[in-house]
Amino acid sequence: MAAVTAKLVKELRDKTGAGMMDCKKALAATDGDTDKAVEWLRQKGIASAEKKSGRTAAEGSIGSYIHTGARVGVLIEINCETDFVARGDMFQELLRDVSMQVAACPNVEYVTTDEIPPEISEREKAIEMGRDDLEGKPEKMKEKIVEGRIAKRLKELALMEQPFIKDSSITVAELVKQAAGKIGENVKVRRFTRYTLGEGIEVEDNDFAAEVASMQNAG
């Protein structure tokens, strides 16, 4: 298998406009053959998606998903460039898939890691720096370990970083990118809200026997 060098990655990136990680995957899948890698990216819809990512996506649709048992519900907004595409089967399928993804990810709070407020990162850093397993380690090593843990934690909070529930070999970001390439427009997940039945309600846990006794005493 041919080595995937930085030079090959840059060459492919310049040709297609695809992201660095996508270029690496394409070259690895095609044994370092740049022409085949371009075809691989086009088949995945990635090359064309990157070129469209700068265009304004002001149309789209708001989708909903209610999980079996009606205990979890999701509202999500995904944008595209035209109303025609928003009404199409491919876009609507993406809307359903990402809605289901949100329902399956109770810890996800943001669309991307870029949206996570700095204070969240600082809070996570304070928690990690105080962990017992870091005690006695050199400061530079400690910082590096903490940095890795924070990055992992922030990814857990971001929808686009999650493995796609129907195909864990790709992330939600890659799913959206592939859909954009196939649709031929810029596609962007803008926002979402996840509802869990009873969330935030404090349920009083009474002892049934004590409750009966108190009712008798009251009588």
Swiss-Prot record:
Residues 82-85 are annotated as: Involved in Mg(2+) ion dislocation from EF-Tu. The keyword Protein biosynthesis applies. Its main location: cytoplasm. Associates with the EF-Tu.GDP complex and induces the exchange of GDP to GTP. It remains bound to the aminoacyl-tRNA.EF-Tu.GTP complex up to the GTP hydrolysis stage on the ribosome. It comes from Synechococcus sp. (strain CC9902). The gene is tsf. Gene3D superfamilies: 1.10.286.20, DNA helicase RuvA subunit, C-terminal domain, Elongation factor Ts, dimerisation domain. GO terms for molecular function: translation elongation factor activity. GO terms for cellular component: cytoplasm. Transmembrane segments: none annotated. Belongs to the EF-Ts family. HAMAP family: EF_Ts. It is found in: Cytoplasm. This is Elongation factor Ts. Keywords: Cytoplasm, Elongation factor, Protein biosynthesis. It holds the Pfam family EF_TS. The lineage of its organism: Bacteria, Bacillati, Cyanobacteriota, Cyanophyceae, Synechococcales. The keyword Cytoplasm applies.
